[in-house]
Amino acid sequence: MSGETNFIADVRHNSHHRAEQKDHHEVDHKRAEPSPKSSVTRRQRRGHEIYFMELDDLYLRGGTPQGRYRRLELARATPHAHVGAGRDGALEDFDSLWMRKDPPFDLKFFFATHLLSLIDQSKCFVMNNPKGLREANEKLYALRFPEQIPQTLVSSSMERLKAFLTQLGGEMIIKPLDGCGGSGVFYLNEQDRNTNSILEAATDNGRRMVMGQRYLPEIRQGDKRIIVLNGEPLGAVLRVPLESETRGNIHVGGQCVKTEVTPRDRELCAALAPLLRADGLYFVGLDVIGSFLTEVNVTSPTGIQEVNALDHVQLERDVIDFVERQVENLTGN
């Protein structure tokens, strides 16, 4: 998914809200893709009309959240995407709204979630819930499940982090609290003369909090991404790091390998499911190394296309089925 596009809005053809069919212009689908391309294509086949917005397209008039949105149509032939002319309207006129904004979590994101929280959710199903997105930092949310995670310390103190490194036996991973795609993640070894320099840079000389976590040697076998829908695992992909890396993220060269959802993975999902549902975090990606949960990705989880390709499945069907059921519950249809 491109970080350019932040929202996907969905309306069925039999809805009261209609799309403009004129003034289309062509764009590269990599910029226009607001969620996995397969999901958008699948919705089109079911007769849904798809629109997209970016953060700057949102605004509030009176007490009504509104936005400037554009119709999106994907095609197999070139050009791969057509985007309609912009038009304005109330967000709750859509049947569903899906927020897909990559980290970092900045003030623009923060205020967008407040605006989206004003949508009448008896009229429009919003996924994930704006309040849940606002409160669920992707690094810190996992700390709500201390029995499922490796030993962890969050601090801005270099001395405290170094003491923790020693306590862990001299190896540790540190990561920023607002990063994504493996950016800013470092492996620390107590014997490395660069350790102090890395901590200085990572903490901005003690002014920025970071997460320190026990190094898990199982990372050599891969970092597993589990796609979770409404608390249930849909599928998983293993991201195996390069020999020279400690990060399995695809952005830094990790190779996607077929894997299974294990009984331990199901245990993790069952442990998280009640809180995920309570927070309205219906579509998430869990990162698991060995038997430990390391992150809960809630803003823009990826992995559907990789699981589809490796397992010859179509996970987007399950996601769209779920959204359709939520909309039907709202409308009573």
List each model region and its residues.
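Conserved N-proximal alpha/beta basic substrate-recognition cap immediately N-terminal to
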Residues: 31-154
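Nucleotide-activated donor-dependent transferases that construct or modify glycoconjugates
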Residues: 18-28
